[in-house]
Structure formats: C-alpha cells, structure tokens
C-alpha cells in the first residue's frame, strides 16, 4: 500500500474532525461504484453506526443500485434508497438518453483540481448532483444523529466535475453547520472525503486493505441490466488504469 493510502486508512480525512470517532455515527453516499464502496468500508472501520444512502435519480446505469443494495447488505449497514427525478431536468448524458456518453481518454483527465479551468467539463456531469445528494444526506445525518457525512470525491484522478473540488466540500460543510439544528446546537457536522488526495490506484489499494470485493462494484456509465461494463467510458477508463497502476487484477465484468 502507498503512503497516501496508509494515511487515509489511519487518519480522519478532514483536520476539523475529532480524532476519536468510534462512538460517533456516519452517513455514507453509496452509488455502488468503486469509490463509494471504498468509502463505506472506510467508514465501517471508524464509526459506531453507518447508514448508507443511495439515489434513484433517473440514471441510465441504474444497475449500480442493485450493487449498492447487495453491498450494503453484506456490509451489515442500514441502507436507504431515495427516489429523486433529476432526469426530468436533463442536461447530462447520464440522465438524458438523447445524449451520447463519450468514450474515455486517460490522457485528458485532470490530475489535480487546479487543472479544471483548462479542461472541458464532460457531458456526464449531472447539474448540481453532489449538492442535491449531500443535502439529502444532511437530512439523514440529522435524523440518525450522525456527525459525519462521507463522500467519495477525489481531486486527483477524476472527470473534472466542479462539485468534486475540496473548496466545494469546504463550502458545503460551512453551509451545513449554518443551516441545521445539529450545527447551531453545537453538534458540528463534518463532510469527510477520505479519497480526496488519492489516485484511483491508491483508492483501490486502500479498499483492498479494507477487504472490499471490487468485483461487485459497478462504475460504468453505460452498465447493462446485468451490471456488465462497457470498458470505454470515462469511468471505465479511470477504473482500468487504476487497477493497472495498483498492480492488481481487474475483476470488472465487461460486456462482450
């Protein structure tokens, strides 16, 4: 395991978080993909009670929800699937079937959020998705007495989405503590991003050390009804490169 992966395993991801979280609760955003499942297992190793939250938002790759449900069950955590019809808004190839999901190109991905201004944001970006998801997770956190919300964003190997940047996460955390009963009564909420500084390979190494079975995860933007990946979209391209760079066999089921 790399030093960065080891640090993510042993340290809280945000400096403002309490060092001792073993008696605290967490909410994990769980899509069923590689990053979010790694976050689920990371959270299970840290918090007393973990609630996983997934969203049925009209995504074309909704087989990821089947994976999320199965993985949450195996992990032994409470799992909520929330229905939100983001698809009616359009604006993303992940929700609009009239738009084409582009093929991936490993050479074009930003390697740090500083590069985002020089990159075209791909049409797989879903407008305001992380803001919507985090807002629902915030409500679940208040109901379940959770002090932590865990989300699998990264600013190293990523597709260039603006709502994956650390400054966005920091701003949301400020808002969360201004806008909630928990925040104003002294029960500070923390947005945890354990993968923020990890490459895809480092994320995979971290998950491997935590016992994640990546064969059950679905990352593909065009996964079929059986969860088989296309192998060529942005997400598949990053995932393939991650396993290769990590020196581990890729357990992904590919179509064809």
From Swiss-Prot:
<keyword id="KW-0479">Metal-binding</keyword>
<feature type="binding site">
    <location>
        <begin position="30"/>
        <end position="40"/>
    </location>
    <ligand>
        <name>ATP</name>
    </ligand>
</feature>
<dbReference type="GO" id="GO:0008616">
    <property type="term" value="P:queuosine biosynthetic process"/>
</dbReference>
<dbReference type="InterPro" id="IPR014729">
    <property type="entry name" value="Rossmann-like_a/b/a_fold"/>
</dbReference>
<keyword id="KW-0067">ATP-binding</keyword>
<protein>
    <recommendedName>
        <fullName>7-cyano-7-deazaguanine synthase</fullName>
        <ecNumber>6.3.4.20</ecNumber>
    </recommendedName>
</protein>
<feature type="binding site">
    <location>
        <position position="236"/>
    </location>
    <ligand>
        <name>Zn(2+)</name>
    </ligand>
</feature>
<feature type="binding site">
    <location>
        <position position="220"/>
    </location>
    <ligand>
        <name>Zn(2+)</name>
    </ligand>
</feature>
<keyword id="KW-0671">Queuosine biosynthesis</keyword>
<dbReference type="GO" id="GO:0005524">
    <property type="term" value="F:ATP binding"/>
</dbReference>
<keyword id="KW-0547">Nucleotide-binding</keyword>
<dbReference type="GO" id="GO:0008270">
    <property type="term" value="F:zinc ion binding"/>
</dbReference>
<comment type="pathway">
    <text>Purine metabolism; 7-cyano-7-deazaguanine biosynthesis.</text>
</comment>
<feature type="compositionally biased region" description="Polar residues">
    <location>
        <begin position="8"/>
        <end position="22"/>
    </location>
</feature>
<dbReference type="Pfam" id="PF06508">
    <property type="entry name" value="QueC"/>
</dbReference>
<dbReference type="InterPro" id="IPR018317">
    <property type="entry name" value="QueC"/>
</dbReference>
<dbReference type="GO" id="GO:0016879">
    <property type="term" value="F:ligase activity, forming carbon-nitrogen bonds"/>
</dbReference>
<keyword id="KW-0862">Zinc</keyword>
<feature type="binding site">
    <location>
        <position position="233"/>
    </location>
    <ligand>
        <name>Zn(2+)</name>
    </ligand>
</feature>
<keyword id="KW-0436">Ligase</keyword>
<comment type="similarity">
    <text>Belongs to the QueC family.</text>
</comment>
<comment type="function">
    <text>Catalyzes the ATP-dependent conversion of 7-carboxy-7-deazaguanine (CDG) to 7-cyano-7-deazaguanine (preQ(0)).</text>
</comment>
<feature type="binding site">
    <location>
        <position position="230"/>
    </location>
    <ligand>
        <name>Zn(2+)</name>
    </ligand>
</feature>
<feature type="region of interest" description="Disordered">
    <location>
        <begin position="1"/>
        <end position="22"/>
    </location>
</feature>
